[in-house]
Amino acid sequence: MTKYIKLTLNLSAFLIVALLGFTLVSLVTHNKLDRLTASNANIVGTMSEYKAAVKDKERRMQCMTQNIYWEAASEPAEGKLAVAQVVMNRAESGKFPADPCQVVYQKNIIYERVLCQFSWYCEQNFNTKPVHKKLWDESAEAARMVMVDGFRLPELKDALYYHADYVNPQWNKKQVAKIGRHIFYK
C-alpha cells in the first residue's frame, strides 16, 4: 500500500508540476502574444505614419520642384538653388507659412487684386506639364539639395524675396545678391 501511496504522491506531484509548468508556459506565451499583438499595432500605426510622412515629403518635393522649374528653369544650377532657398527661408522665418508648399501657393489680396508670391502660380502653370525633362530633373535635384540635404548659399541666408532683373517692383528692401537673372533681397 505504501508503494501505491508513494506512486500516487509521485504521480500527483508530477501532475501538479506539469500543470504548473503548462500554466507558466501558457502565461508566458500569452504574455509574449499580447506584447507581439501590441507591437504589431504599433508597427501598423508606425507604418501608416511612415506612409503619410513619405506622401507629405513627396508632395513638398513636387511643389518645390514645380516652383524651381517655373521660376528658374533656364537659370544656372546656383539660380535654381537660390529660388529653393528663398522658399525655405520663408518657411523657416515665421513671417510666412511654415510649409514650403503653402509658401509657394500663397496668395495675397492687395487693393482687390490677387497677387501670388510666385508669378507662375497666378498664371495657372501648376496644371501645365513641364516640357523639358532635363530642366525638370535639374529642378528636382535643386529641390532635393535644399530640402533634404540642407544645402544653403551663404550670401542668401537672410533672403526672403527676389525678382527677375527685367522687373522693377519698387521694393524698399536691401539687395543681398544677384544670381543669373534674379536679384535677391532680405
Predicted region positions:
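Intrinsic disorder/low-complexity segments
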Residues: F14, L19, S39-N42
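N-terminal Sec-pathway targeting helices
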Residues: M1-V17
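Hydrophobic alpha-helical membrane-insertion segments, chiefly the h-region
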Residues: V17-V28
